[in-house]
């Protein structure tokens, strides 16, 4: 039985399932992080599954073999939030050293701001809760807190190391954010 969290192996994948998991454990995993904003802040879900069960986070998922990033964003938003994404734009990259320090896999997330969508919000069974936040809750991925604060999308709670005034996060391309590209 395939791991329902990762869903990375498809029937048309060029590797066997055993080969896929052997490689998967040894290399960074590309993910997309879905950023949906509204009048009440940023939409977060609380994970009901491992890894990081019980933590607040941006909905996200592994990019599948042969999948375009925009298609991965649309798939994850549909599966985890019940939303149909019609437009999104890349905000930047999130690395997860806290995962590496815990001996977990090694994700590298590309965050996309959903700028246009349709449908009614309906979170999947992968989430035990969801909420809209202007001030980010405790119990959230620290890397995602830093990213959202640096992007100016939310206020952080309990950031251990504030960035010096004027310092940019290396994962956020402000030119792309400002130009709307």
Sequence positions of predicted segments:
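Acidic, metal-coordinating catalytic segment for phosphate/diphosphate chemistry
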Residues: 1-33
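Conserved hydrophobic "DFG−1" position in protein kinase catalytic cores
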Residues: 36, 44, 114-116, 132
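Conserved Nudix-box catalytic region and its N-terminal flanking loop in Nudix hydrolases
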Residues: 41-80
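A short coil-to-beta-strand element that immediately follows conserved catalytic motifs
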Residues: 84-93
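Active-site-adjacent beta-strand/loop module that shapes the phosphate/pyrophosphate-binding cleft
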Residues: 94-120, 152
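NUDIX/MutT-family hydrolases
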Residues: 111, 122-153, 178
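Charged phosphate-binding loop/patch that engages nucleotide di/tri-phosphates or the phosphate backbone
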Residues: 147-181
């Amino acid at each position: 039985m395939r791991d329902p969290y990762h869903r990375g192996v498809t029937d048309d994948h060029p590797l066997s399932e055993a080969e896929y998991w052997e490689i998967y454990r040894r290399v960074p995993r590309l993910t997309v992080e879905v950023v949906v904003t509204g009048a009440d802040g940023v939409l977060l879900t609380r994970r009901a599954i491992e890894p990081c069960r019980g933590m607040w986070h941006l909905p996200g998922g592994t990019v599948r073999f042969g999948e375009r990033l925009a298609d991965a964003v649309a798939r994850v938003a549909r599966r985890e939030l019940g939303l149909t994404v019609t437009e999104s734009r890349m905000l930047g990259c999130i690395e997860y050293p806290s995962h590496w320090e815990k001996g977990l896999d090694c994700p590298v997330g590309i965050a996309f701001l959903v700028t246009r969508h349709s449908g009614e919000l309906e979170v999947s069974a992968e989430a035990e809760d969801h909420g809209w936040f202007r001030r980010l809750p405790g119990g959230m991925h620290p890397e995602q807190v830093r990213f959202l604060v640096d992007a100016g999308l939310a206020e952080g709670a309990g950031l251990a190391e504030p960035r010096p005034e004027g310092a940019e996060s290396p994962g956020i391309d402000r030119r792309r954010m400002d130009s709307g590209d």
